[in-house]
């Protein structure tokens, strides 16, 4: 035995140290900062940081999250695998991962003022569209029926969308989908026609929610409609969840069975999603016996193992931070400012003779109809981009093309985070008005050269350097936007 021990000792002593300890280069690879380790990627990040700081961000689904959220998002929680749910994982070593996820769930219920006896929440969905699919699949079988707001009328792809030729959204391949619409004259959801269609179509789920609808949804009316056809009411509050948490607009939770949301828009968290579900009694049978909700297990199973493997623990931890911030007085004031800024922006457009879909806004966004201005949203979006204003083209009721729509969607959450007030948004509208006029002028010049298609227009404009007006506006925006606070 002594001979064997000596043999083993001699064998280990002969192994070069680098076989069981990190070399200097290996340590450097693991510990070097990004700027040193990968200057190419670092340069891209720094360029994007400058772009964000020197731009006016008006995309309604974007925001600037806090330093604390960013710290959690880039933390060691990234390193851990944790398939399953707290207390029931398929991997060991999840004590603190469980703590973070449970904290996130608790804060989610608190942020939206929910009773844990009546509501539960899954915080593992990776993003909004998968969360919607996971919720649908929990309560629907393939080819069951679903209704959502039509995409050209302000809906979202994840609520189902088809053309006469084919299904565009995968949701419309899994399920039979029928859209409901807004009234083209008022821009408000046509609840009467929705009710008639729902009674005939008999959907299993009706989605209340939108990505480009500036008015409040009548959840009470939609609940009444779902009860007529024994459907679930699913509210997708992705855009407005921050406003709902702050209580500055009505909450869908009083009427909905299921509520989904992303976490990075008005909620100002990381890029993730949540699914809230009711618990307890859903209805009563003819004898008065309670019929219970059975959503918790179905939704949890649909998320994992149905559609996902391991959750993104760094995102869940960062979301817990954001939800904690959502309960503060400062967050409440922020959401009030988001609303007042949106109304100021809407009024400024109306004063300048612009047509707004629905005539104004009750939320964080404004949908501008450019039809009367003789130019489309795609061309205006491009010139705005060249002067460091980020917005997005958007369909308005009656549009036939999502690529060259007549609308422009504008939101206030991101710039409000940076400290823009009502007067600042009036100036923003002034800048946009200048861009609309400039775009029309440039497009007319392009048409004279036979460049009628949008791709021809983009080629004609190029990087904008040949147009002095673009250079002037860009310089003005960079100087002005750069003065505002930037959270990271």
UniProtKB/Swiss-Prot annotation:
EC assignment: 2.1.2.1
Mind telling me where the transit peptide is? Answer: 1-20
Instruction: Identify the domain of life.
Output: Eukaryota
Q: What pathway is this protein said to act in by its record?
A: One-carbon metabolism; tetrahydrofolate interconversion
- Alphabetized PANTHER family for the sequence: SERINE HYDROXYMETHYLTRANSFERASE (PTHR11680), SERINE HYDROXYMETHYLTRANSFERASE, MITOCHONDRIAL (PTHR11680:SF28)
Subunit-structure text:
Homotetramer.
* Protein name per its UniProtKB record: Serine hydroxymethyltransferase, mitochondrial
**Organism of origin:** Schizosaccharomyces pombe (strain 972 / ATCC 24843) (Fission yeast)
